[in-house]
Amino acid sequence: MPAESTSPAELRAGGCQTRPVQPRRLLLIRHARAAGGPVDLERPLTEQGMRQAAAIGPWLEETGLVPDRVLVSPARRAVQTWEQASAALSSGVQPISEARIHDNTVDALLAAIREAREDVVTLAVVGHNPSVGELAGVLDDGRGDPVARRKVEAGFPAGGVAVFDLAVPLTAVGPGAATLSDFRVPGD
């Protein structure tokens, strides 16, 4: 008979002790409030947007959701959002500029996410609507937090962060493959 401290996963592995698997997470972050402008890629954050973005970092730190990999749209407002958010983080994770995020399609976002390295535990994607909101809607398997789900369905506001727990590797992320565990707009 296995010891009481043997986990179900260890039992399935024939009683062999294994390292606990750290749950993978995906953070979808919509850039904070931005100013208008004639050149989309150059639109900056407003003062309110700067405050919104600055509130994201402390929230990520306090909730233990600091990503170990960040993909950011090359648009100025997305880059500024991550710069402001990351200023409060204890880790020095450097963002990776990902042009496909600015394509603003669910397929482009999924393609970028699926290329994450195998060792990534928490991946953050800083992008734009409508693709961020649409992806949040299709990823959810319906078993997550109902309050968070209602917030996502009501619209994905500027500065919003959707937190998904993944039961699959990032390479297999797709519709219905994640559980929405939280949705916040830090600073609001």
At which residue positions do the language-model features occur?
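Domain-level recognition of soluble alpha/beta enzyme cores
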Residues: 140-179, 185
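Residue-level preference for the first positions of well-ordered beta-strands
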Residues: 26, 122-124, 161
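Active-site-proximal alpha-helix that buttresses catalytic centers in soluble enzyme cores
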Residues: 21-104, 140-146, 156
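Glycine-rich phosphate-binding loop signature in dinucleotide/nucleotide-binding domains
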Residues: 63-65, 116-121
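Short phosphate-binding loop-to-helix
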Residues: 101-118
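A glycine-rich beta-strand to alpha-helix segment
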Residues: 120-142
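Extreme N-terminal basic, low-complexity initiation segments
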Residues: 1-10
